[in-house]
């Protein structure tokens, strides 16, 4: 309609229509209704999709006065040029580009958003033309160069806008204008652009900045011009240079990296290795450093230049020269000045880049004096930024610039100090001492430290200001603490004794304070007014000292065997000749006494004495509890103590001496195998656990840390053997089995972990009699209590009573804990034990079908058992588990089918259930990949009967499970993204791994599954659509192999061919899906060649325009030319996918017009 109107000279009517629509869209909500607004939006959408709108758009740009209409005209030109590229003459495109550029130049007062959109259209035209070399940037650069040299600020700003538009459009393969072209297309354009055109832009920018450097006293307008060019320089230097031959998937990964380092091609060598360029940016920064916005850009430019690497350097010598020159420039820029807040992050980024990007041998090759000045500067800045970061914490600033800068510098230190190849031992010791001392000082209260001190004195934070939601310091500052701990190890000679003396001093003071409070309470119990300021300061000091000690003595180890850090081991070995072992053991074993009161206390091992200092903190806490002073204690300190003890025990307690070249004698004597020290310390730690669970049951985090310590004590057989020799262990087990207070007050997650620990302990090296005793005292009571409850005649009537529900919940949590404790050597006993429960749990599903939290917990028990045990089960046992899981799903499905979810909470509950069911099915499916049950050795002696002859695979079970829950998957539930993704991942997984199972499915399930795939491709997110396309490919391949042209799957794939054809040819789709869609399309074309030809013929027959008809026919012929007839051959498929890229570039979007 629009195109026809334009062709008939009806442009004024079109303009009037668009201007009226713009008025509606721009009107306040009170003036227009929803329907009017939608109609107005439809007019613009229809206009933008109209065929060849160029003449009418030009007319609009020249005559309309409505900015929004001008903006839409520019957008319509941009989209139509790409859409109709193959139909346009090259001269028409060139004149269109010239028209747009001239239009902007002649109208300096255009609204910014209109100007930017017109320039974006120019950039898109240049980009699309760069691929077939019909347009290049040379003429544009010539014009821009003239604009820059005009000296007119308005014109220079416009020149900058033109360059920025080009840069933005070419810079990324994934974030450019959505013009329906593939990532490869954008990637190829980017590669061509970055070779020469990008450097041209940089040179133009440098010219402007040189002019800026020369000028004095700039007016505001000129300053604004230079700021824009500086931002442009930053954009160029932050360019993510694409390496050659990078596939689509890798382009996306490559471009998603956050920290882009400057790695230009060789062609940039002359430009960037010219020392005047680097000097220019240092000079510019010195000139504008007090202007916050400009300083951000100039520092970012310098940070990018500090990351220069790759083929731009011809040899190592040029790298050394560049680095030396840069460090000189940096030291000259920052020496003797007070760094502004806005400079901190930038300067730390520069230093971080220099240290991490330049190889260490280049760093050490610069003149010694220069390197020494650089490292001293790094130490000074680290301490200074650390102090400012601590101040930010006190003032609770939103923008923590110094904290970010400090973190970067600490990471830089780690890079340096961990390199013993280029720096001799002790090279950084003094610097490490400096940074470590500064950190400790910032975290201690006055007078020893500066915590909470502002420039004007004390700014102490009130206790209630600390938010409940605040992350724990040990998590929030884990990277910082890891760096400080590493620096502490480098300077162990200084740092370990320092921490010991600070901790011992605080313990003495804490003990004294608590005694004073006790006396005060005894003297006047009613007074109650105790000044806690001193205590709070002590607790905060101890908190930070324990955290630093924990990170100094042990590393974070996830999934690895924790090892004593070599620096700590060497330090202990080095001084072992000066150590008296007996005194060391006495200090370790007397946490109730002051270390200095023990004769010869100075001849103890320093590492063990540091551990002893923390045991003394723990002892003061225990004594305060016994003296009924719990209300004065800090739960945070309690958490810190057990966190440290867990971390320490994992690494040092009964360390495996085979893992070390040499071991410290004091360590092996104090807590090695078969020593009194290790037995004593295990007993001490166990006592701590039991005391904490009794006293702190309401403090969930502290109770959780405490049971984690218990798990650490029993997860290794060697430690567990010592634990089970303690009477306390058996008392704890019996108490838990009886559910007597205070253990039954613990939260459910803590009870679950406690059960896990008790089970792990139960499988230590006990004799048969002990094992039987353990079974009788720990696991049997659980079973007995459970059966007593559910076998009561009136169970149905009393099941909702609070006491009964608590008993059931506690049992279910305990079952999860038991499952979590599964290992290959206990799976036989635990599986048989748990199976009895699982069958009873299915009965509970009926009883509690209207109690969502119980249903959820029952499913979770099954999820845990499947997750932990399925991989160890032989065929018969796996069959038992499969049957139990399917019965569970049948009951769940029966209870929930057709049930009306009246409120959001009920829907949320079902969402949680189904998410767990998806996890259960995924866990069962893992049996097909992870199977340790080659022999049923682990079940010898535990087999109730022989395996049956049924062979059912996990895939069969999972498909049957999917059949049960599919009817529950309502459209509303699939709106939960995590559930939707989990569901589609599961069915795609099944289709990819077991495509042969799909045709054998019952008819209803097969239809449901096909409908799910259709729904996923047409109505879900692009991630789900991609999963469905990935599922269709193996199904089509399976169909081709089977060669059954009358099967239901054959008919379904024919329908999918039409869907994928429409998606690729007729609809706008996310270009990132082109590969998945292309692979599915190719396989479907191989399977249904006649239908594909029919689809093409039908499409061509609808084309009225002979030019479009011919172009489309040629494009389709070319598409299948490389694979005629198409076969399921990888080489042919790859050729087809390459042709498809070209096809999409030429005709993609051509048919999405009105």
From Swiss-Prot:
GO molecular function, one term: nuclear export signal receptor activity
Major localisation: cytoplasm
Family: Belongs to the exportin family.
Record's protein name: Exportin-4
Species of the source: Gallus gallus (Chicken)
Domain of life: Eukaryota
Keyword Protein transport among UniProt keywords: yes
Keywords assigned: Cytoplasm, Nucleus, Protein transport, Transport
UniProt function note: Mediates the nuclear export of proteins (cargos) with broad substrate specificity.
GO cellular component: cytoplasm; nuclear pore
Localization in the cell: Cytoplasm; Nucleus
Gene: XPO4
GO biological process: protein export from nucleus
């Amino acid at each position: 309609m629009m195109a026809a109107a334009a062709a008939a000279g009806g442009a004024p009517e079109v303009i009037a229509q668009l201007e009226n629509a713009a008025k509606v869209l721009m009107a306040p909500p009170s003036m227009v209704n929803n329907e009017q607004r939608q109609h107005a939006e439809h007019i613009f959408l229809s206009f933008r999709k109209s065929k060849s709108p160029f003449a009418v758009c030009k007319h609009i740009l020249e005559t309309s006065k409505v900015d929004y209409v001008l903006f839409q005209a520019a957008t319509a030109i941009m989209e139509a040029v790409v859409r109709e590229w193959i139909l346009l003459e090259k001269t028409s495109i060139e004149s269109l580009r010239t028209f747009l550029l001239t239009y902007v130049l002649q109208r300096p007062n255009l609204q910014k958003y209109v100007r930017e959109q017109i320039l974006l259209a120019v950039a898109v035209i240049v980009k699309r033309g760069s691929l077939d070399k019909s347009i290049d940037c040379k003429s544009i650069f010539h014009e821009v160069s003239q604009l820059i040299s005009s000296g007119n600020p308005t014109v220079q700003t416009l020149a900058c806008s033109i360059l920025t538009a080009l840069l933005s459009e070419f810079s990324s393969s994934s974030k450019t204008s959505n013009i329906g072209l593939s990532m490869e297309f954008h990637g190829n354009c980017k590669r061509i652009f970055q070779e020469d055109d990008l450097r041209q832009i940089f040179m133009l920018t440098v010219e402007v900045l040189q002019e800026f450097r020369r000028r004095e006293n700039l007016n505001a307008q000129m300053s604004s011009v230079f700021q824009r060019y500086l931002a442009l320089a930053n954009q160029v230097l932050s360019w993510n240079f694409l390496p050659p031959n990078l596939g689509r998937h890798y382009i996306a990964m490559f471009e998603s990296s956050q920290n882009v380092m400057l790695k230009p091609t060789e062609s940039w060598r002359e430009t960037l290795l010219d020392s005047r360029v680097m000097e220019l940016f240092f000079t510019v920064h010195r000139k504008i450093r007090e202007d916050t916005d400009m300083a951000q850009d100039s520092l970012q430019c310098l940070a990018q230049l500090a990351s220069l690497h790759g083929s731009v350097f011809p040899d190592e010598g040029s790298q050394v020269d560049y680095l030396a020159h840069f460090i000189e420039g940096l030291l000259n820029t920052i020496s003797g000045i007070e760094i502004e807040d806005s400079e901190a992050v930038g300067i730390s980024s520069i230093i971080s880049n220099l240290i991490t990007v330049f190889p260490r041998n280049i760093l050490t090759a610069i003149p010694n004096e220069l390197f020494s000045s650089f490292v001293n500067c790094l130490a000074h800045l680290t301490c200074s930024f650390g102090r400012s970061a601590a101040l930010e914490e006190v003032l609770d600033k939103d923008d923590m610039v110094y904290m970010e800068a400090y973190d970067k510098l600490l990471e830089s230190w780690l890079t340096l100090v961990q390199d013993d190849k280029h720096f001799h031992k002790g090279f950084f010791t003094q610097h490490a001492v400096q940074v470590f001392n500064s950190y400790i000082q910032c975290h201690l209260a006055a007078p020893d430290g500066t915590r909470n001190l502002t420039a004007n004195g004390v700014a102490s934070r009130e206790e209630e200001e600390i938010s409940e939601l605040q992350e724990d310091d040990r998590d929030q500052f884990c990277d910082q603490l890891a760096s400080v701990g590493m620096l502490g190890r480098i300077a162990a000679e200084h740092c370990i004794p320092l921490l010991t003396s600070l901790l011992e001093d605080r313990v003495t003071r804490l003990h004294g304070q608590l005694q004073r409070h006790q006396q005060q309470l005894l003297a006047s119990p009613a007074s109650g007014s105790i000044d806690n300021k001193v205590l709070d300061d002590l607790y905060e000091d101890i908190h930070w000292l324990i955290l630093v000690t924990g990170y100094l003595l042990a590393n974070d180890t996830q999934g690895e065997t924790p090892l004593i850090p070599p620096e700590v081991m060497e330090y202990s070995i080095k001084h072992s000749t000066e150590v008296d072992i007996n005194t060391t053991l006495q200090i370790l074993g007397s946490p109730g006494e002051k270390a200095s009161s023990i004769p010869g206390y100075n001849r103890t091992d320093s590492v063990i004495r540091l551990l002893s200092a923390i045991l003394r903190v723990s002892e003061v806490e225990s004594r305060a509890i016994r003296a009924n002073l719990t209300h004065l204690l800090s739960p945070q300190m309690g958490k810190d103590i057990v966190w440290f003890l867990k971390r320490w025990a994992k690494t040092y307690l009964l360390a495996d001496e085979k893992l070390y070249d040499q071991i410290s004698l004091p360590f092996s004597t104090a807590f090695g195998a078969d020593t009194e020290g290790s037995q004593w310390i295990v007993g001490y730690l166990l006592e701590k656990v039991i005391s904490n669970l009794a006293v702190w049951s309401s403090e969930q985090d502290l109770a959780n840390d405490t049971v984690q310590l218990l798990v650490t004590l029993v997860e290794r057989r060697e430690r567990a053997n010592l634990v089970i020799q303690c009477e306390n262990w058996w008392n704890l087990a019996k108490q838990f089995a009886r559910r007597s207070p205070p253990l039954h007050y613990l939260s459910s997650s803590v009870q679950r972990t406690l059960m896990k620990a008790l089970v792990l302990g139960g499988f230590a090296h006990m004799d048969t009699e002990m094992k039987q005793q353990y079974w009788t005292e720990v696991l049997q009571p659980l079973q007995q209590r459970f059966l007593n409850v559910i076998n009561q005649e009136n169970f149905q009537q009393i099941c909702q009573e609070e006491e009964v529900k608590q008993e059931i919940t506690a049992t279910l949590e305990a079952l999860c804990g038991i499952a979590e404790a599964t290992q290959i050597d206990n799976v036989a006993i635990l599986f048989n034990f748990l199976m009895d429960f699982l069958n009873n749990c299915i009965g509970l599903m009926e009883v509690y079908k209207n109690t969502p939290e119980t249903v959820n917990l029952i499913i979770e028990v099954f999820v845990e058992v499947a997750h932990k045990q399925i991989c160890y089960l032989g065929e018969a046992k796996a069959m038992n588990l499969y049957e139990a899981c399917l019965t569970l799903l049948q009951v769940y499905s029966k209870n929930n089918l057709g049930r009306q979810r009246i409120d959001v909470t009920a829907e949320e509950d079902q969402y949680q259930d189904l998410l767990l069911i998806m996890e259960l099915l995924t866990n069962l499916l893992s049996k097909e990949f992870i199977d340790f049950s080659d022999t049923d050795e682990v079940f010898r002696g535990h087999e109730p009967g022989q395996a049956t002859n049924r062979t059912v695979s996990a895939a069969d079970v999972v498909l049957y499970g999917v059949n049960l829950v599919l009817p529950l998957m309502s459209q509303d539930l699939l709106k939960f993204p995590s559930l939707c993704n989990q569901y589609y991942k599961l069915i795609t997984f099944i289709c990819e791994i077991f495509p042969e199972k799909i045709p054998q499915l019952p008819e209803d399930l097969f239809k449901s599954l096909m409908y799910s795939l259709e729904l996923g491709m047409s109505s879900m997110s692009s991630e789900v659509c991609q999963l469905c396309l990935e599922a269709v490919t193996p199904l089509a391949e399976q169909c081709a192999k089977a060669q059954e042209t009358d099967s239901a799957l054959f008919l379904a794939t024919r329908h999918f061919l039409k869907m994928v054809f429409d998606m690729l040819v007729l609809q706008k789709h996310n270009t990132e899906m082109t590969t998945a869609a292309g692979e599915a399309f190719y396989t479907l074309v191989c399977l249904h060649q006649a239908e594909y030809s029919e689809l093409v013929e039908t499409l061509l027959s609808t084309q009225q325009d002979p030019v479009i008809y011919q172009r489309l026919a040629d494009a389709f012929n070319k598409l299948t030319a490389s694979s005629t007839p198409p076969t399921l051959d990888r080489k042919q498929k790859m050729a087809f996918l390459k042709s498809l890229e070209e096809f999409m570039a030429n005709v993609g979007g051509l048919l999405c017009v009105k």
